[in-house]
Amino acid sequence: MAAMRWRWWQRLLPWRLLQARGFPQNSAPSLGLGARTYSQGDCSYSRTALYDLLGVPSTATQAQIKAAYYRQCFLYHPDRNSGSAEAAERFTRISQAYVVLGSATLRRKYDRGLLSDEDLRGPGVRPSRTPAPDPGSPRTPPPTSRTHDGSRASPGANRTMFNFDAFYQAHYGEQLERERRLRARREALRKRQEYRSMKGLRWEDTRDTAAIFLIFSIFIIIGFYI
């Protein structure tokens, strides 16, 4: 698992260009940023790769980065893209990018080109709760459950599916509520304008009728005197 994360970070970060130019590389399979820190003089260092992955500019606020992270996770979550290795890899890369950009300290170092493996192994980074299995040790098969008829169920049968409605409501509920209120105000304004237009039209009709009646009455009165 650690070696797989190392390969993902190599594809994720633009520092592979530095390796091709002969810069040293840390062989330790951590999060894969390399033990060497890159100064501002390294012209090949890209300070926008992680931002591009989340789809935000480098000037984005922490709230915008968090919203983009939730949006990307929603699009590429494995439960939503079952069987897609590309989506699973993209989901992992998005999570790793948010480890850096979601932290103000790590983001500042990344923007300056000073991010290293030591920073990612620091207390600000949450390690995985489940250790990677030893390749040499025998693997215990996952427990299987039995159905009511006594047959064995598949290991993934009891897997809880990802609740996209709850996810979207939890992270976008406030925005949805603002949009709902805005639509309600627009609808009320439209009805008010229609009512005023109809009221104005009725007044114009009444005014024209009254003017015609007044002119007709004047002609009748003049006719009597003539």
Curated annotation (Swiss-Prot):
The keyword Phosphoprotein does not apply. Residues 1-38 form a transit peptide. InterPro entries: DnaJ_domain, J_dom_sf, Mito_ATP_Synthase-Asso. SUPFAM superfamilies: Chaperone J-domain. Residues 116-157 are annotated as: Disordered. It is linked to DNAJC30 is located in the Williams-Beuren syndrome (WBS) critical region. WBS results from a hemizygous deletion of several genes on chromosome 7q11.23 thought to arise as a consequence of unequal crossing over between highly homologous low-copy repeat sequences flanking the deleted region. WBS is an autosomal dominant disorder characterized by multiple clinical manifestations including neurologic features such as intellectual disability, cardiovascular, urogenital and skeletal features, and distinctive facies. Associates with the ATP synthase complex. Interacts with MT-ATP6; interaction is direct. Interacts with ATP5MC2; interaction is direct. This is DnaJ homolog subfamily C member 30, mitochondrial. It comes from Homo sapiens. The lineage of its organism: Eukaryota, Metazoa, Chordata, Craniata, Vertebrata. The gene is DNAJC30.
